[in-house]
């Protein structure tokens, strides 16, 4: 069976068992900043397992895209060199949220793996592990399924602590946890390795293909295991691993999907399609890079973008090792789309965007190599001894993406070595930081957990009555909040919009007889709306009735901006093209901010076109229509869904101007487009590679912005003694006059420097056959001093020159050494000493160097170093 057929068979099998097929979530975990990337099928259901979210189904099945590169789960350095390590993989999974448990989960797994209608694997090839004390699972396997005892293995606590076992899973130090049972496939005696639990278990003979986790306990901070009221099931089976089994190969790189990617990689690079690890690196990395970009990650120097940049550059480096010339990586995207585009339509939709990002990053990496070389040269100029420190090697690798092996090559050419141990210490420190940031980082038992959902009344108005169903103080449920206390109020129904979809939460107040709670913000936890604020008067108790009143002016101003965001999105696709995808937004009462995919700055005429289109829709004053429907019907109608956003079974479709703008949106909006009044773009710029940002204002804020601009024009006209009508002519004449004066000033400086050079040459002293000149010239910039040093070198012949001066409170230094002396004396070494004396740094070539500092009082001491430098060096 091909990989695509296995994926579909798995999902269809569990659909027949009453599971809801759920689309893969984004690689960027929703509402979970503690997790770097989605790395397991259960990530998108985490709140369901924690009891914080309830869905319309209790059984689910998915094929989840996962990335393991950076953080706790980091396979990057092994990729390409082993048979089964990948940065990207698919995890097939079936899940039960308080529905079925061990018996059904085990029988389902066995039926799918061995059933004639399904995978039809030979039963005698399958081994099973269970947690040492999980007699229930052991008995189901042996007495009901019929797995013989000789192929059953009990795994105890093999990681040095109670419940620390390959067969015991935990979400964190506290919270849901439980035993797991794993299914292994035996590749046969011709492959080295032993069964699970044996000393040879790390061999390739017995390969884990399926893991069933039984969440049946809640571990509290004291280590006590409490049975969960509704035990759940979380399973995972790696698609690539089971594909290798069914296709009778021993390496994931030999399965159909990778064979096609390896072929495309070899063609793009122009090398042989052989078993080279570097080729496997490229074929693997195109998957993780493409999917990360499709999900909104872009190369950067921090966080997720930094990991993406590392993966891209690793692929480029390995491509270069295979002989690639120029950019090649982006050319493989088409082959990936052909393989996986049907299962993951976001690849098809964003193919051009992915290719452009990869090509841009490849080109940037080529420039980065040049930059890294310059940085390395500066560090080598300051090097004392013959070993490049580990922190320098790490800085080049980590900050500039400079490959360690290249640093090593350069060091070897100069008879230097690198401090490999020091570099490894820096790398380990980075890994520790990543591991710390990748943990869930929360105590499950201190989370705000609310049963039920809050009914939202805000589409109908800004006020309503509700009953208090829960109160929280410092994350703990309480029965009462006293006057002056800060806390969270949960109502059975509310007109307050909870922050989501880029729109900020509502503010306002809750009121009852003698009681007032000022609401500063509103957020969501599962389906509940959390009103954050302070008790301004009286006290609140669970069960009490309150009147909820949203700040109407803030809500209305926010609605103007949110509706304008939808119009802007549609206008962008009209003006720039369908490649435009929303990458983020912020909507509050003051402004709107919209991030989107595009590869160049928007031209002035395009910005004007955007404003004209949006304002035309505003003037049309069409009704804003909403419709509640299911997600599939909404997409069939052309509604734009934001990839990675979590949508329920029922969605709200918002339409403006007929079919001008049709999007899925749960936010609050105007009734008619004319309510927006006016739309004005205030700024446009880049926020990351391939992502632009537009900020704008609407309504009264737009009028205020235009009035402010008008006042600035009047003030500018007054400053140049003109009017609004002739302001541009006046400014043009002023700038031309300024350029003329600057040119005259440069000419005067050059004459002064030349005259100074004539005078200075006479001040040079001779030391060991070389002329040495050190002089102070305040008021000259580095450019003028460089020209003067060049002039003096020609006048003096065999010479060492150090010039410095104070300019705008800072020290400027320039050093020069004539070519006949650079074998013994280096301008960079002299500059290093002189700049250090004035509290600064410097460097450059052996014949010319620049530097500076902040301590002008030490300038004369710095200049005096020139004579000693020559005396010691000759």
Curated annotation (Swiss-Prot):
UniProt main location, coarse: cytoplasm
Reaction(s) catalysed (UniProt annotation): tRNA(Ala) + L-alanine + ATP = L-alanyl-tRNA(Ala) + AMP + diphosphate
Cofactor: Zn(2+)
Keywords recorded for this protein, A-Z: Aminoacyl-tRNA synthetase, ATP-binding, Cytoplasm, Ligase, Metal-binding, Nucleotide-binding, Protein biosynthesis, RNA-binding, tRNA-binding, Zinc
Listed EC numbers: 6.1.1.7
Signal peptide from the UniProt entry: none
Comment on bound cofactor: Binds 1 zinc ion per subunit.
UniProt xrefs under InterPro entries: aa-tRNA-synth_II/BPL/LPL, Ala-tRNA-lgiase_IIc, Ala-tRNA-ligase_IIc_anticod-bd, Ala-tRNA-synth_IIc_core, Ala-tRNA-synth_IIc_N, Ala-tRNA_ligase, Ala_tRNA_ligase_euk/bac, DHHA1_dom
Subcellular location(s) of the protein: Cytoplasm
Residues annotated to bind Zn(2+): 562, 566, 665, 669
GO biological process: alanyl-tRNA aminoacylation; negative regulation of DNA-templated transcription
Segments forming a coiled coil: none
GO cellular component, one term: cytosol
An example molecular function term from Gene Ontology annotations: zinc ion binding
Free-text note on domains in this protein's UniProt record: Consists of three domains; the N-terminal catalytic domain, the editing domain and the C-terminal C-Ala domain. The editing domain removes incorrectly charged amino acids, while the C-Ala domain, along with tRNA(Ala), serves as a bridge to cooperatively bring together the editing and aminoacylation centers thus stimulating deacylation of misacylated tRNAs.
Similarity comment: family membership: Belongs to the class-II aminoacyl-tRNA synthetase family.
Protein task: Catalyzes the attachment of alanine to tRNA(Ala) in a two-step reaction: alanine is first activated by ATP to form Ala-AMP and then transferred to the acceptor end of tRNA(Ala). Also edits incorrectly charged Ser-tRNA(Ala) and Gly-tRNA(Ala) via its editing domain.
UniProt-recorded name of the protein: Alanine--tRNA ligase
Organism: Pseudomonas aeruginosa (strain ATCC 15692 / DSM 22644 / CIP 104116 / JCM 14847 / LMG 12228 / 1C / PRS 101 / PAO1)
């Amino acid at each position: 069976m091909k990989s695509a057929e296995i994926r579909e068979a798995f999902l269809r099998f569990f659909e027949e068992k009453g599971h809801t097929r759920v689309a893969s979530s984004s690689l960027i975990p929703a509402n979970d900043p503690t997790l770097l990337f989605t790395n397991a099928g259960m990530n998108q259901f985490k709140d369901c397992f924690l009891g914080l979210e309830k869905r319309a189904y209790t059984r689910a099945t998915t094929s989840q895209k996962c990335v393991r590169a950076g953080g706790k789960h980091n396979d990057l350095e092994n990729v390409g060199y082993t048979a089964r390590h990948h940065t990207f993989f698919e995890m097939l999974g079936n899940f039960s949220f308080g529905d079925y448990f061990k018996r059904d989960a085990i029988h389902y797994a066995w039926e799918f793996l061995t059933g004639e209608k399904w995978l039809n694997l030979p039963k005698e090839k399958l081994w099973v592990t269970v947690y040492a004390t999980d007699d229930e699972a052991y008995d189901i396997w042996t007495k009901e399924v019929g797995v013989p005892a000789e192929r059953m293995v009990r795994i105890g606590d093999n990681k040095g602590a109670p419940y620390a076992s390959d067969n015991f899973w935990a979400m964190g130090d506290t919270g849901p946890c439980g035993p797991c049972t794993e299914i292994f496939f035996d590749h046969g005696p011709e492959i080295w390795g032993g069964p699970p639990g044996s000393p040879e278990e790390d061999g390739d003979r017995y390969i884990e293909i399926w893991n069933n986790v039984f969440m049946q306990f809640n571990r509290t901070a004291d280590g006590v295991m409490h049975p969960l009221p509704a035990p759940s099931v979380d399973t995972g089976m790696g698609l690539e691993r089971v594909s290798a089994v069914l296709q009778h190969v021993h390496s994931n790189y030999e399965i159909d999907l990778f064979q096609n990617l390896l072929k495309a990689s070899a063609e793009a690079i122009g090398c042989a399609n052989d078993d080279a690890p570097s080729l496997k690196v490229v074929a693997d990395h195109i998957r993780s890079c493409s999917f990360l970009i499709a999900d909104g990650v872009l190369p950067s120097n921090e966080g997720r973008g930094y990991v993406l940049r590392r993966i891209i550059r690793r692929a480029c480096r390995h491509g270069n090792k295979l002989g690639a010339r120029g950019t090649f990586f982006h050319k493989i995207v088409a082959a990936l789309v052909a393989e996986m585009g049907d299962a993951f339509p976001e690849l098809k939709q964003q193919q051009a965007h992915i290719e452009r990002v990869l090509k841009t990053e490849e080109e940037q990496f080529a420039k980065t190599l040049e930059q890294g070389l310059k940085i390395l040269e500066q560090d080598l100029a300051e090097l004392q001894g013959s070993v490049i420190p580990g922190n320098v090697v790490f800085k080049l690798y980590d900050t500039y993406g400079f490959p360690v092996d290249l640093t090593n090559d350069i060091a070897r050419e100069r008879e230097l070595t690198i401090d490999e141990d020091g570099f490894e210490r820096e790398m380990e420190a980075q890994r520790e930081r990543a591991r710390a940031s990748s943990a869930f980082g929360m105590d499950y038992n201190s989370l705000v957990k609310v049963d039920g959902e809050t009914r939202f009344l805000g589409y109908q108005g800004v006020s309503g009555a509700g009953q208090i169903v829960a109160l929280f103080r410092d994350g703990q449920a309480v029965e009462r909040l006293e006057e002056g206390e800060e806390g969270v109020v949960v109502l059975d129904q509310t007109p307050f919009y909870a922050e989501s979809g880029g729109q900020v939460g509502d503010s306002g107040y809750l009121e009852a007889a003698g009681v007032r709670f000022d609401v500063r913000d509103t957020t969501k936890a599962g389906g509940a709306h959390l009103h954050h604020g302070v008790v301004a008067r009286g006290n609140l108790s669970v069960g009490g009735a309150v009147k909820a009143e949203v700040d109407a002016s803030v809500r209305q101003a926010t609605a103007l901006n949110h509706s304008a965001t939808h119009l802007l999105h549609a206008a962008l696709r009209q003006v720039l093209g369908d490649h435009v995808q929303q990458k983020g937004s912020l909507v509050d009462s003051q402004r709107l901010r919209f991030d989107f995919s595009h590869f160049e700055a928007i031209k002035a005429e395009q910005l004007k076109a955007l404003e004209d289109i949006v304002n035309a829709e505003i003037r049309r004053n069409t009704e804003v229509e909403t419709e509640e429907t299911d997600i599939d019907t909404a997409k069939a109608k052309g509604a734009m869904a934001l990839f990675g956003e979590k949508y329920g079974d029922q969605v709200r479709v918002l339409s403006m101007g007929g079919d001008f703008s049709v999007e899925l949106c749960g936010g609050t909006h105007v009734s008619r487009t004319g309510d927006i009044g006016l739309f004005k773009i205030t700024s446009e710029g880049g926020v990351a590679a391939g992502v632009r940002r537009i900020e704008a204002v609407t309504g009264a804020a737009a009028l205020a912005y235009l009035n402010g601009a008008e006042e600035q024009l009047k003030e500018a006209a007054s400053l140049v003694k003109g009017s609004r009508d002739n302001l541009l002519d006046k400014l043009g004449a002023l700038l031309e006059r300024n350029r003329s004066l600057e040119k005259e000033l440069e000419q005067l400086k050059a004459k002064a420097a030349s005259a100074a050079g004539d005078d200075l040459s006479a001040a040079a002293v001779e030391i060991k056959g070389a002329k040495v000149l050190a002089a102070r010239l305040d008021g000259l910039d580095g450019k003028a001093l460089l020209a003067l040093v060049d002039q003096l070198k020609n006048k003096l012949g065999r010479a060492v020159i150090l010039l410095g001066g104070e300019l705008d409170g800072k020290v400027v230094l320039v050093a020069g050494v004539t070519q006949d002396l650079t074998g013994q004396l280096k301008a960079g070494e002299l500059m290093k000493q002189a700049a250090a004396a004035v509290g600064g740094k410097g460097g450059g070539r052996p014949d010319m160097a620049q530097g500076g500092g902040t301590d002008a009082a030490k300038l004369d001491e710095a200049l005096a170093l020139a004579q000693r430098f020559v005396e010691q060096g000759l």
